[in-house]
């Protein structure tokens, strides 16, 4: 019985020690760094991280998800293409940012105010 308990304990430790998350962060303004320091999605090692977060998207006045940069739509595609080399990679999009809350009303507060405004946001994210 003791051997079975030890075996089960070792199996539990083994199962949990192999599971980890390494979350990395990519900023959309890395493309504007000076020459030699510019950084694009293709420069990311897709096996370095289990999850990579792209920053940022924003919530517009219509409570829809929107791009910050003029080329974010193309950058999202390039970012998600990292999964072609590593299908296990999880890519995520951060909404907000350091100046997203500027103004008299928070875009998040405005968006969550009613079921209808939440639905508009959710539908825009799913597209």
Regions found by a protein language model. Give the residues of each.
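Cleavable N-terminal signal peptides of Sec/SRP-targeted secreted and luminal proteins
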Residues: 2-19
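Glycan-recognition patch characteristic of GH18 chitinases/ENGases
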Residues: 17-127
């Amino acid at each position: 019985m003791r051997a079975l308990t030890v075996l089960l304990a070792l199996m539990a430790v083994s199962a949990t020690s192999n599971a980890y998350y390494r979350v990395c962060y990519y900023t959309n303004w890395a493309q504007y760094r000076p020459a030699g320091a510019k950084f694009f999605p293709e420069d990311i090692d897709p096996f370095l991280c289990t999850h990579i977060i792209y920053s940022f998207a924003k919530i517009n006045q219509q409570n829809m998800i929107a791009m910050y940069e003029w080329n974010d739509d193309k950058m999202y595609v390039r970012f998600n293409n990292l999964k072609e080399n590593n299908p296990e990679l999880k890519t995520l999009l951060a909404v907000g940012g350091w100046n997203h809350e500027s103004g008299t009303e928070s875009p998040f507060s405005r968006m969550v105010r009613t079921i209808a405004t939440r639905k508009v946001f959710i539908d825009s994210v799913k597209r």
